[in-house]
Design a protein with these regions (language model features):
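TRNA-binding/sensing appendages of the translation machinery
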Residues: 1-82, 86, 94
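Short secondary-structure capping/junction motifs at helix and strand boundaries
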Residues: 38, 97-104
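Beta-strand scaffold of nucleotide-dependent catalytic cores
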Residues: 104-107, 115
């Protein structure tokens, strides 16, 4: 019996020339941001669902229709992060009391949308520079 191994619908691999372009963009982004003393951060792909709901907004399409969330062993609802704002806000709230905090990040985000050309369930998000002092 032949097994069909394929991508999950709405996802894609990045490789070859497309990967080279992607790496170039990421490198330029970090280079420019570092010139302005922004610090990079890597946050978990999983977040508490209520955190995302509060920071993004309960009534937004992201929370009401597009978020991948599930009950984690009957303890709490968690989700695959749909964007970076919630993770950056959580980090800032729990790690900094005062002062200037300039953070940047990039990484995979997940949205349950109807797949179509150019729109994927898994996307790479490059955060805009975050400045909680503004």
């Amino acid at each position: 019996m032949k097994r069909n191994i394929s991508l999950v619908k709405g996802t894609h691999d990045i490789h070859g020339a497309e990967m080279e372009k992607f790496e170039f963009i990421i490198e330029k982004f970090y280079s420019v941001c570092r010139n302005f003393n922004f610090k990079s951060i890597q946050t978990p792909i999983l977040e508490q669902q209520d955190l995302v709901s509060r920071t993004v907004g309960e009534q937004t399409d992201i929370v009401s229709k597009e978020m991948y969330s599930f009950l984690d062993k009957g303890e709490a609802y968690i989700c695959l992060r749909p964007e970076a704002t919630s993770s950056l806000a959580r980090f800032a709230a729990s790690n900094y009391q005062s002062g200037l905090l300039k953070l940047i990040t990039h990484g995979p985000m997940f949205r349950r949308e109807r797949p179509q050309k150019g729109r994927y369930l898994s996307l790479i998000h490059i955060s805009e520079p975050t400045r909680p002092d503004v």
